């Protein structure tokens, strides 16, 4: 997508990313340098993305979640992300606008990409989220959501869906915007992600 491999980020991409994210020119330029160090080709594979993501969460297992995040941002399904896709992924998972984040969250939960979400897909993502929560934090969760199965059940019940029903993107976004409890249940705590990213930038 027009990324320069010479070590400088093209003006067009820099301006576009500043427009679409909250990141500053300095942050983006610094990230681009470290991105090129990790990925000299200017593209990042799923394995490389998992490796970078795991550095944000050294005391948990984010591999499964990172795979789903990667899938949701690999727009052309070529198995790689360029710098622009990578930064948008970071932005959307931490600081995007509510509706943008929910559109992304829908694509995250729509594991097979068929345009609807099933209860099994909810469970698959929730299981990936649970691998990122420290065991001592899991113990602090309420009894009706302290396992992936219970949390998936609770999410599905909030949407008023039967076992084999499907959830459309519109239902997902409207239901989540109308109920903060659903929003809390469907995501890994974004504040923790933000804190980890800030630590890495320092």
From Swiss-Prot:
Acts as a calcium sensor and regulates phototransduction of cone and rod photoreceptor cells. Modulates light sensitivity of cone photoreceptor in dark and dim conditions. In response to high Ca(2+) levels induced by low light levels, prolongs RHO/rhodopsin activation in rod photoreceptor cells by binding to and inhibiting GRK1-mediated phosphorylation of RHO/rhodopsin. Plays a role in scotopic vision/enhances vision in dim light by enhancing signal transfer between rod photoreceptors and rod bipolar cells. Disruption phenotype: Knockout mice exhibit reduced scotopic vision acuity, however do not show rod photoreceptor degeneration. Rod photoreceptors have a higher visual response threshold resulting in a 4-fold enhancement in sensitivity to low light intensity, with no change in pupil size. Dark adapted rod photoreceptors have a reduced recovery time following stimulus, a reduced adaption time to background light and sustained photoreceptor signaling response following stimulus. Rod photoreceptors have an increased sensitivity to stimulus in saturating background conditions. Belongs to the recoverin family. This is Recoverin. Keywords: Calcium, Cell projection, Disulfide bond, Lipoprotein, Membrane, Metal-binding, Myristate, Oxidation, Redox-active center, Repeat, Sensory transduction, Vision. GO terms for molecular function: calcium ion binding. The N-terminal glycine is linked to one of four different types of acyl groups. The most abundant is myristoleate (14:1), but 14:0, 14:2, and 12:0 acyl residues are also present. The Ca(2+) induced exposure of the myristoyl group, known as the calcium-myristoyl switch, promotes RCVRN binding to the photoreceptor cell membranes only when intracellular Ca(2+) concentration is high. Oxidation on Cys-39 occurs in response to prolonged intense illumination and results in the formation of disulfide homodimers, and to a lesser extent disulfide-linked heterodimers. The gene is Rcvrn. It comes from the Eukaryota. Ca(2+) 2 binds at residues 110, 112, 114, 116, 121. Pfam families: EF-hand_5, EF-hand_7. The modification Cysteine sulfenic acid (-SOH) is found at residue 39. Residues 189-192 are annotated as: Interaction with GRK1. SUPFAM superfamilies: EF-hand (SSF47473). Residues 41-59, 61-96, 97-132, 147-182 form the EF-hand domain. Expressed in rod photoreceptors in the retina (at protein level). GO terms for biological process: phototransduction; regulation of calcium ion transport; visual perception. Homodimer; disulfide-linked. Homodimerization is caused by prolonged intense illumination. May form a complex composed of RHO, GRK1 and RCVRN in a Ca(2+)-dependent manner; RCVRN prevents the interaction between GRK1 and RHO. Interacts (via C-terminus) with GRK1 (via N-terminus); the interaction is Ca(2+)-dependent. EF-hand 2 and EF-hand 3 domains are the low-affinity and the high-affinity calcium binding sites, respectively. EF-hand 1 and EF-hand 4 domains do not bind calcium due to substitutions that disrupt their respective Ca(2+) binding loops. The cooperative binding of calcium to the EF-hand 2 domain following EF-hand 3 domain calcium binding requires myristoylation. Calcium binding to the 2 EF-hand domains induces exposure of the myristoyl group through a protein conformation change, this process known as the calcium-myristoyl switch facilitates binding to photoreceptor cell membranes. A lipid is attached at residue 2 (N-myristoyl glycine). Ca(2+) 1 binds at residues 74, 76, 78, 80, 85. The record marks 192 as: Interaction with GRK1. The keyword Repeat applies.
């Amino acid at each position: 997508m027009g990324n320069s491999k010479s070590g400088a980020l093209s003006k067009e991409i820099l301006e576009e990313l500043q427009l679409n994210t909250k990141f500053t020119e300095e942050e983006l330029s610094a990230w681009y340098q470290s991105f090129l160090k990790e990925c000299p080709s200017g593209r990042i594979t799923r394995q490389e993305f998992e490796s970078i993501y795991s550095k944000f969460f050294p005391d948990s297992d984010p591999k499964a979640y990172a795979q789903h995040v990667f899938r949701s941002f690999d727009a052309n399904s070529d198995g790689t992300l360029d710098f622009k896709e990578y930064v948008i992924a970071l932005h959307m998972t931490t600081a995007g606008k509510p509706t943008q984040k929910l559109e992304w969250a829908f694509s995250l939960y729509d594991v097979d990409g068929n345009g609807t979400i099933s209860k099994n897909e909810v469970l698959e993502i929730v299981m990936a989220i649970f691998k990122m929560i420290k065991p001592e934090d899991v113990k602090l969760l309420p009894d009706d959501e302290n396992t992936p199965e219970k949390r998936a059940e609770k999410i599905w019940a909030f949407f008023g869906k039967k076992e084999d029903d499907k959830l459309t993107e519109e239902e997902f976004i409207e239901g989540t915007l109308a109920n903060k409890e659903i929003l809390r249940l469907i995501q890994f705590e974004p504040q923790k992600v933000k804190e980890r990213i800030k630590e890495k930038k320092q």
